[in-house]
Amino acid sequence: MTDSTRRQFLRSLGVATAAAAVRPRLAFAQEVRVRTVAGTGVAGYEPEGSGGLVATQTPVNNPYGIVAGPDGALYFCEVDTGRTRRMDLGTGRLTTVAGNGEAAYTGDGGPALAASFSAPHEIRFDRDGHLFVVERDAHVVRRVDAQTRVVSTVAGTGEAGFSGDDGPATEAQLRQPHSIAFVANGDLLICDIGNGRVRRVNMRNSTISTLSGTGERRAPTPDTGPLDGTPLRGPRSLDTDSDGNAYLVLREGNAVYRLDTGAGRLQRIAGTGEQGMTGDGGPGSTATFNGPKGIAYSASDHSLYIVDTENHAIRRMSLATGIIDTVLGTGERGDGPDGDPSQCRLARPHGVFTHAGVVYVTDSENHRVRALEGVL
């Protein structure tokens, strides 16, 4: 989902390690701090009732994908329970909007709260306000209708494989899809990581095709090349901007690529392909990552926020200057403390999203959602 689409939604509503010690400190116009907005640090689930529970006093369980909804609330999915949770940013209360807590692929044609979801990795809203969930272990993408709350499958058969290009998306096979995003024309992109491809669903006629990738999972991805016929080494996560670009994180490739969907070209813009945590204060193209698994484009500062998962950090690369820095995390695994983001340890974060001047992060194995304030 693009930032312009999010703004259109919301307008109508009115709504330190040694390594860290040598990193350049960033200068911001206001105080920068990180705080926990959901979760207690212990995995679990408590029934919320009709009024919800205070998010900071309520356990969550391995949160992954995160996004702001058309109602201005924060939504995130829990990979272990299959639930999608909603946090009201005004009241700070947490409710469940999809998933019954069972890991399975059931419930199409019925209400979202009665459906089972299997390892949801990411969630997005389309421009009509429908919620989309990508399920790694069910090998599908499903939709929760904005009005009826009824669940339906939009891509995948529930069986792992690769088939169906140029035909109906619901008759095509995916293999461990991890990430989804919408491009400006409304089409849905899917990181079909088990097939080494990015798939594209034409949402006007519900057909699927391969946008990029060849299925050669171990082949290196060149620095530049055509989208068609170029191998992708671990296409893990993507986000889009309003200019027709998609930004793709390669997990095994330890790099970020820009996919120009109009010109049909890709280009490496961050990461050398080597594992590491270097390059802060310099060009993103010479930096190193370690198993990056999430990305968000921010129109507010024309930057990419990259979840450097195995480095337990959030990196930011300005698309205007190309410079990269670490904005949250020390490079070592831990749990907090809240406050100074350069001293706050994370534990394998997976999701990131920017909304209303705040960077939200799913600190997955700490079972928390954190908010980074003052960087936008």
Residue ranges and their predicted role:
Residues 79, 136, 193, 251, ...:
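Short loop/turn segments immediately following the C-termini of beta-strands
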Residues 1-17:
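N-terminal secretory signal peptides and thylakoid transit peptides that target proteins
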Residues 31-62, 92-119, 148-176, 206-234, ...:
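Gly/Pro-rich loop segments of beta-rich domains
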Residues 73-75, 130-132, 187-189, 245-248, ...:
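Conserved beta-propeller blade signature
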